[in-house]
C-alpha cells in the first residue's frame, strides 16, 4: 500500500510568512511597491501584482507618496538611504534573522574584521549583507573558493552564512578556512528553520521511493532541499505548480 508523507516542516518559514502577510496587509493602499520580489515565489508575486502591488528595483522608479515594502531577503544600507532620500513610507519586511546578520557584519567590520560570507554571491540576501560591511568582504560557496581564499593574517576574520545555505556544506567550508590558521570567529547564521527542513528532508528521502519538492525555481531554500533529497532518493522531482505535478506524475516509478 502506497503512503504519502508530508514533511512536518513543509510550508513557509516564519520570516517568509511574516513578509507575505505584511504585503497583503498593505494591499488596497495607494502606490504600494515591494523592493524586489517580496519572496522567491512567482505565484505569490503574481497574485500581489494582480492586487496592485508592484515590484521595483530602484528608488528612481517611485514617487514621494509611495509605500515601499522591503523584501524578506533584505537590502543594502545604500538602498535604505536612497529610499529615505525619496521621503517614502518604508515598511521593512526583512526577515529578523537576516537583520541580525546585517547588524553582525556592520559591527564586526567596523571593528576591523574581514568579513567572509558563505553563500551565493548573486542571491539578493547575500548582496544585501555585503552592503552592510565597512571592511573587506569575501563571498564563497565552494570548496575550491575556500581553498583559494587568501586573507590578511594580521586581522581578525568573521564568518557568517546566508540563512538558507546547506548546513553540512557550511561546516565543510568553515573547516577549510580554519585550517589556514587565521584568527577566525564563526557565526552560524543559517536559520534554524532551514536546518530543520534540511534534516527532515534528508531523513524522509532516505526512506522514500519518490520525493516531490514543491517550491519556486528561484528559491534558494527549495533548491537546497531538492539537492539534498536528490542525493538520497533518485526519484526526486522539483515542482512549482500543480500543472507540473500532473506531468511529473506520469514519470513516477513506484
Question: Model-flagged regions — what are they?
Answer:
Residues 187-193:
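Long, charged amphipathic helices and adjacent flexible linkers at domain junctions
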Residues 250-254:
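Conserved small/polar residues in nucleotide/adenosyl-binding loops
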